[in-house]
A protein has these predicted regions:
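Cofactor-binding active-site loop characterized by glycine-rich and histidine/acidic residues
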Residues: 17, 28, 34, 44-199
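A structural signal for short, well-ordered beta-strand segments and their strand-loop junctions
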Residues: 40-41, 75, 207
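N-terminal glycine-rich anion-binding loops that anchor highly charged ligand groups
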Residues: 22-23, 41, 45
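N-terminal capping segment at the start of a domain
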Residues: 21-37, 209
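Non-catalytic, mobile gating and regulatory segments of ester bond hydrolases
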Residues: 1-18
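Long, well-ordered, tryptophan-enriched scaffold segments
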Residues: 210-215
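Residue-level marker for buried hydrophobic side chains located in beta-strands
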Residues: 177-178, 206-209
Length: 215
């Protein structure tokens, strides 16, 4: 990726993003079918938005070191759509793993298995000792910056992080919050919108996936 994230500069990447989207979509279907549990609708309908956010350069993050202090933050407000994040990380990490094996270039070297989510980890989705069914900021998913689950749960946290960053003089750090339209029914969502406007949280980006699935 270059520093230019205009549409014209990124257009050549779109074909690869589309292939990545297809891989993530198929993985979501596979792990939910394998486990016979989970939330497919909201997980699949957010794939495009998440990939564009992660790959376009609009969000500053490092897949190898997501805990970097001044990296942008991701809050999955709709925590039940966590298969989206698991499968996205699995695809991107596998690409880096293959690239490192081919080149030996340290830029593609990932941390150990305790910090990296691989294809095989997906088999443990919603199983004891495996990947949990809702978003958790831990271990292999330090990309996430809050533990979420119920509708609207992560909205106040996202706004709080954005406010704290501004008050700490780090207003250049952006907070990206992903939610579905059903999550807007919670009172907390409306309170967050009003608060974000009143507090001028221009570092909070609230991405609403209007999928009409509801769950």
């Amino acid at each position: 990726m270059t520093g230019d994230n205009t549409v014209s500069a990124l257009e050549a990447e779109f074909v690869y993003w589309e292939k990545t989207k297809d891989l993530v979509d198929q993985l979501i279907d596979l792990i939910l079918n394998y486990r016979q549990s989970g939330h497919p609708g909201g997980s699949r309908s957010k794939v495009h938005a998440l990939l564009v956010t992660l790959l376009s350069g609009v969000m500053r993050w490092d897949i190898r070191r997501p805990e970097k202090r001044f990296g942008d933050r991701l809050v999955l407000v709709a925590g039940h759509t966590i298969p989206l994040v698991y499968c996205t990380l699995a695809v991107l990490n596998e690409a880096l793993r293959v690239k490192y094996q081919q080149t030996g270039d340290e830029r593609y070297r990932l941390p150990g298995p305790e910090r990296t989510l691989y294809w095989e980890d997906l088999l443990g989705f919603r199983r004891l000792g495996g990947l949990p069914g809702h978003a958790e900021m831990a271990g292999k998913t330090l990309l996430l910056k809050f533990n979420t689950g119920p509708t609207g749960h992560g909205a106040p946290a996202a706004a709080g992080e954005a406010l704290a960053l501004k008050r700490a003089g780090a207003g250049g750090v952006k907070v990206f919050a992903f939610e579905g339209e059903a999550g807007l029914t919670a009172g907390a969502a409306h309170e967050v919108m009003n608060s974000a406007w009143g507090l001028a949280l221009d570092n909070l980006f609230y991405v609403v996936d209007w999928n009409d699935f509801g769950i």
